[in-house]
Structures are given as structure tokens and as C-alpha cells.
């Protein structure tokens, strides 16, 4: 009798990619985080897409849209929690992936390492936008705190913060 993970067409793809991956025996569990990053990223994209279908940037109805997602949308509460906790899991996997690279000396491959640094900055910028743009006062607080970190840059810091804000201060609870 054949195992279903080896005979079913879709399960066979997952089995060959994650379980029976042809890899050297000296690869430890540290080398799994690249695949986990891909899984977390796909989960973030899919849940974010479905959450964006119910998004409203108006400060008067923002909280109502969150309660609408949690109460009225089928499994909306699950989408919201998967998206929030998936972001944390994504960054945990990302930092462990970087830690593995530091431990095994991958920084000696400068081209590859520099591409990884650029990807890290792109991920952090995307996460910042995802944190700042949605509903609620936390977005205004997050925008103020995170962008004020740039004011620590000598000579251009305060001008840079004013340029990012588009003025003297953040106006509404959402930056749309």
C-alpha cells in the first residue's frame, strides 16, 4: 500500500519539496528557514489580499471595518490573526535565517550577502508601510515613533522626517 503523500499529485509536490528533499545529510534544521520564509510570505500575501477587500481608510469607520471582518466575514477572525501572527513568524524566520548565515560565514559571499541586505531593507520598508497604513490610532503612533528614529541622523535627520511626513506632523490616524 502506497503512502498518500507519495501517491497524491498535490501531496507529492509538498512531499518532494519539504519531507523527502534530496539534500546532503550534514544540513541541519537551520537550513529550513528559507522555505519557511516562503510559506510565511505566501500566507501574508493571501491573508492581506482578503483583508484588503474589506479595508477602509476613513478614520470614522476604520474600527467598524475591523469588527466587520471579525464578526461578519466567514473566518475573518482567522484571517486577521493569521495575518498578524504570520508577520511575527515571518520576521522570526527572517532573523534566524540571517543568524544562520552569520554563523556559517555566508557573509564572505559578498554579492549574495549584499542582495540579502537589500531584500532585508525592502522587507522592512514593506512591513513599515503595512503597519502604518491600516486602521486605528496605533498606525499614527507607529508612524510617529518609527519615523522619528530617522531624526537621529546627523544634519539631515529632522528634514528627512518632515519630508517623509509630508509636513510638520502626521494628520490622521491613517496615512492615506
Swiss-Prot record:
Q: What does the sequence similarity comment in the record state about its family? A: Belongs to the cytochrome b family.
The GO cellular component terms are: mitochondrial inner membrane
Record's superkingdom? Eukaryota
The note on cofactor binding and number reads: Binds 2 heme b groups non-covalently.
Which positions does UniProt annotate for heme b b566 binding? 97
Q: What is this protein called?
A: Cytochrome b
How would you summarize the oligomeric state and partners of this protein?
The cytochrome bc1 complex contains 11 subunits: 3 respiratory subunits (MT-CYB, CYC1 and UQCRFS1), 2 core proteins (UQCRC1 and UQCRC2) and 6 low-molecular weight proteins (UQCRH/QCR6, UQCRB/QCR7, UQCRQ/QCR8, UQCR10/QCR9, UQCR11/QCR10 and a cleavage product of UQCRFS1). This cytochrome bc1 complex then forms a dimer.
Instruction: Report residues binding heme b b562.
Output: 83
Cite the InterPro entries for this sequence.
Cyt_b/b6_N, Cytb/b6-like_sf, Cytochrome_b_N_euk/bac, Di-haem_cyt_TM
The entry's localization annotation reads: Mitochondrion inner membrane
Q: Which UniProt keywords apply?
A: Electron transport, Heme, Iron, Membrane, Metal-binding, Mitochondrion, Mitochondrion inner membrane, Respiratory chain, Transmembrane, Transmembrane helix, Transport, Ubiquinone
Its membrane topology:
Multi-pass membrane protein
Q: Which cofactor does it need?
A: heme b
Transmembrane parts of this sequence: 33-53, 77-98, 113-133
Function per UniProt: Component of the ubiquinol-cytochrome c reductase complex (complex III or cytochrome b-c1 complex) that is part of the mitochondrial respiratory chain. The b-c1 complex mediates electron transfer from ubiquinol to cytochrome c. Contributes to the generation of a proton gradient across the mitochondrial membrane that is then used for ATP synthesis.
Provide any one GO MF term from the record: ubiquinol-cytochrome-c reductase activity
**Further facts:** Heme 1 (or BL or b562) is low-potential and absorbs at about 562 nm, and heme 2 (or BH or b566) is high-potential and absorbs at about 566 nm.
Amino acid at each position: 500500500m502506497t503512502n498518500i503523500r507519495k501517491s497524491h499529485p498535490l501531496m507529492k509536490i509538498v512531499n518532494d519539496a519539504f519531507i523527502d528533499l534530496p539534500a546532503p545529510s550534514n544540513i541541519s534544521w537551520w537550513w529550513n528557514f528559507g522555505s519557511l520564509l516562503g510559506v510565511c510570505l505566501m500566507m501574508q500575501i493571501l491573508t492581506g489580499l482578503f483583508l484588503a477587500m474589506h479595508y477602509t481608510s476613513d478614520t470614522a469607520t476604520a474600527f467598524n471595518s475591523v469588527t466587520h471582518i471579525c464578526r461578519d466575514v466567514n473566518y475573518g477572525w482567522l484571517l486577521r490573526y493569521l495575518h498578524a501572527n504570520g508577520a511575527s513568524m515571518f520576521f522570526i524566520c527572517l532573523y534566524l535565517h540571517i543568524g544562520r548565515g552569520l554563523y556559517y560565514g555566508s557573509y564572505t559571499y559578498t554579492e549574495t550577502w549584499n542582495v540579502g541586505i537589500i531584500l532585508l531593507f525592502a522587507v522592512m520598508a514593506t512591513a513599515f508601510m503595512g503597519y502604518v497604513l491600516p486602521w486605528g490610532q496605533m498606525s499614527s503612533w507607529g508612524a510617529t515613533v518609527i519615523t522619528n528614529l530617522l531624526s537621529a541622523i546627523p544634519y539631515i535627520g529632522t528634514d528627512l522626517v518632515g519630508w517623509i511626513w509630508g509636513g510638520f506632523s502626521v494628520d490622521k490616524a491613517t496615512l492615506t
